[in-house]
Every structure is written in C-alpha cells, then in structure tokens.
Amino acid sequence: MKRVGAHVSASGGVEQAPLNATAIGAKAFALFTKNQRQWKAPKLSKATIEAFQKACADGGFQPQHILPHDSYLINLGSPDPEKLERARSAFIDEMQRVADLGLQLLNFHPGSHLKEISEEASLLLIAESINMALEATNGVTAVIENTAGQGTNLGYRFEQIAFLIDRIEDKSRVGVCLDTCHLFASGYDLSSTEAIETTFNEFDSTVGLHYLRGMHLNDAMQPLGSRVDRHASLGKGTIGMAAFTFIMNHPACEEIPLILETPNPDIWSEEIALLYSLQQVD
C-alpha cells in the first residue's frame, strides 16, 4: 500500500499530530516532536507518550509510516566546534524523543559548510555526527533528506548522500528521504516519466533504493536546477504530474511515508485523494 500523508501540526502536543493526519485522510504523517525553532524542550511526559501512541493506533499509523523531522537549527556539518557540539547534542536529544514515542525514523537535513570549510570536510563532520547519534541511542534510523542545494547546504547530490552512508558504521540504521522539489531544484529532472525513471535509476546505482525510507511530495516553484527551495502545490509548479504518477506506481515507494509539504494545508485532503487517484490498478 502507498502511505500518503502530510507534515501536520503538533500544536497543542504531539498527540494532536495523528488526529490532524486522520482528519485529512492520511495513511502516514510527519511532525516535529518539539518546537523546531528552539534548541531545548522539556522531556515528553508519560501521559503525552501514551496519548500519542493511542492516537496513532486509533488512526492505523504504524511507526514505519511516521516521519518525525528534526529542528531546522541543527547543522551537523558546522565548521564551528562549539556550534557543532551543540548541534550534535540537540540531534541526539531529537533521536531520543523519537525513541521515547516508540517511533523508528528521524528525518534531517545533512548540514552546511557555511563557506568556512570544504564540502568534504563538512560531510566528514556530518558522518561523524550521525555515527555519534546512532551510538548514543537505540532503534532509531537516521533518515538523510536530499536538499535543494540552496546556499551552502550539502546533500544536494546523490554522490554526497552515498559519501555519508559509506561512512556510517551501522548501515541498518541509516536511510534516505527524497524530496521531489529538492531533487528538481538541485538539477535532477522529474518533468516526464522518462526523466524521473532516469533519476530513480541514478539514485539506485549511486545510493541504492533499498535505503529509501520516505519521500516528500512537493511540486516546485522554480525551474530545474534553480537551487531554490520553494515548494508548490501538486500540479501547480514546474515539475508536473508525471513524477507523482510514477511515484504512486513504483514498488520502492510501497509502505513508506509519502509526505506532502505543499504550501496550502487547506487542500491537503484533496492532494492526498489526487495522489491515490493516480494509482493504476493491475
């Protein structure tokens, strides 16, 4: 089964997220387990954890269909030793929160070199950061998200993601989330069935489709290779619908969270229904 959902609000407590997902007809969801603009948050209470798990069970959401995202403040490739230490500590805390909720995945943007060190030096710091977090926690997979390559963000080429995975000690606990807008912005064409098939094949040969743990389904505001991270509603941007039809019929996308981060939450239920309508019956 394809598991389509959206990055829903957890305002009022994480237990609200599965309720918000159910309300839009989602079969998966993403959330922040804390305020994504803050470094610290109180530990999740037993009551909150139990309420979250009950809401997930009631909505039919399994842990592998839920894709928590870490704080935007965290830069695991920071050239500043003090900031790097803070980022690593915060990332471990995010992983522990995911584990406390009984979940299995933590989606994150790799990091940025900030023009102060080389791309490779920053990638080595990111790999080291991931290894440290996996060592300090149990049961949670680090899910690397490809980026649009905006500014000095790394992870915009499949080769960079492969570089990171090659250096992860426990490869059973590393995966990838592919964002369609980011792919297109970073130069991977998705604008036709042939184009996205070529991109998927390149990902498979460079990284491996067996590492795919989730996707973010977003159209793009800017043209191919723009390196600008601006999401558009499905069919309203520069990617077009062929890519989403391909994804909704690709076996590698079975039973993983396929998450909308499109700009209009009011039409998420319609976009979810649209995606399911693209499935071809055998």
UniProtKB/Swiss-Prot annotation:
It catalyses: Endonucleolytic cleavage to 5'-phosphooligonucleotide end-products. Its EC number is 3.1.21.2. Its cofactor is Zn(2+). CDD domains: AP2Ec (cd00019). It comes from the Bacteria. One of its GO terms (biological process) is base-excision repair. The keyword Metal-binding applies. Zn(2+) 2 binds at E145, D179, H216, E261. It is an enzyme of class 3 (hydrolase). Pfam families: AP_endonuc_2. Keywords: DNA damage, DNA repair, Endonuclease, Hydrolase, Metal-binding, Nuclease, Zinc. Zn(2+) 3 binds at H182, D229, H231. The keyword S-adenosyl-L-methionine does not apply. Zn(2+) 1 binds at H69, H109, E145. Binds 3 Zn(2+) ions. One of its GO terms (molecular function) is DNA-(apurinic or apyrimidinic site) endonuclease activity. HAMAP family: Nfo. Belongs to the AP endonuclease 2 family. Endonuclease IV plays a role in DNA repair. It cleaves phosphodiester bonds at apurinic or apyrimidinic (AP) sites, generating a 3'-hydroxyl group and a 5'-terminal sugar phosphate. This is Probable endonuclease 4. It comes from Chlorobium chlorochromatii (strain CaD3).
